[in-house]
């Protein structure tokens, strides 16, 4: 059942996937559902809803990524980083979260599913000082745009950008962007079977 749904959703967003990638995505849902019972990683309890709200909600960003090296801040159980890493094996993803149980889950997922282009780091974002900066800084359900930019300003490389995954856009939030940053693009995203607004904001340091 889940397999057929995934197939249909990927076709709907026009995202080609190999048999191995589809298996990894479904296995990720299975592990998230299993671990969630003990670790409370997400409020979503139904695997079919996980597929929409977590997997597809992450993957609609995939074709908009520019660059090779990304960091997912406040990643939680690895969203959107793990689904994006599965679908973009040529790119590398660092998953950053301050909670150890989430990091342990991410590492187990990467090990069991054979995902070799992710690494997980337990740290608060403002305390994390990478040796190499990033082409893209991803945030989903992490913080307000203002706080995200304030805390993550040191993470992008010279020509890197921020990718803020948001629901409904708030005029107040959009108007309170810190000095020195600019929104370059606002993209309306359509997530299969999700009747809610989704947007991707691309932001650069000026």
From Swiss-Prot:
HAMAP family: 16SrRNA_methyltr_G (MF_00074)
The organism of origin for this protein: Shewanella oneidensis (strain ATCC 700550 / JCM 31522 / CIP 106686 / LMG 19005 / NCIMB 14063 / MR-1)
Enzyme class: transferase
Pfam families named among the record's database cross-references: GidB
Record InterPro entries: rRNA_ssu_MeTfrase_G (IPR003682), SAM-dependent_MTases_sf (IPR029063)
SUPFAM superfamilies: S-adenosyl-L-methionine-dependent methyltransferases
Gene: rsmG
Residues that bind S-adenosyl-L-methionine: 74, 79, 125-126, 140
Job description of the protein: Specifically methylates the N7 position of guanine in position 527 of 16S rRNA.
Name listed for the protein in its UniProt record: Ribosomal RNA small subunit methyltransferase G
A GO term from the CC aspect: cytosol
């Amino acid at each position: 059942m889940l397999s057929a749904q995934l197939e249909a959703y990927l076709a709907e967003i026009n995202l080609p996937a190999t048999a191995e990638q589809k298996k990894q995505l479904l296995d990720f849902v299975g592990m998230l559902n299993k671990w969630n019972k003990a670790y409370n990683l997400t409020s979503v309890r139904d695997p079919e809803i996980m597929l929409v709200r977590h997997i597809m909600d992450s993957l609609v960003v995939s074709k908009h990524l520019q660059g090779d090296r990304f960091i997912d801040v406040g990643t939680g159980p690895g969203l959107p980083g793990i689904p994006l890493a599965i679908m973009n094996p040529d790119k590398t993803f660092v998953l950053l979260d301050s909670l150890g149980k989430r990091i342990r889950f991410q590492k187990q997922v990467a090990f069991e599913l054979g995902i070799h282009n992710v690494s997980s780091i337990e740290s608060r974002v403002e305390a994390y000082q990478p040796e190499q900066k990033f082409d893209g800084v991803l945030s989903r359900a992490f913080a307000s745009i203002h706080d995200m930019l304030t805390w993550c300003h040191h993470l992008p490389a010279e020509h890197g950008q921020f990718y803020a995954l948001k629901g409904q856009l708030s005029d107040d939030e959009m108007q309170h962007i810190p000095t020195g940053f600019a929104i370059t693009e606002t993209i309306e995203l359509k997530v299969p079977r999700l009747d809610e607004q989704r947007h991707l904001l691309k932001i650069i340091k000026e």
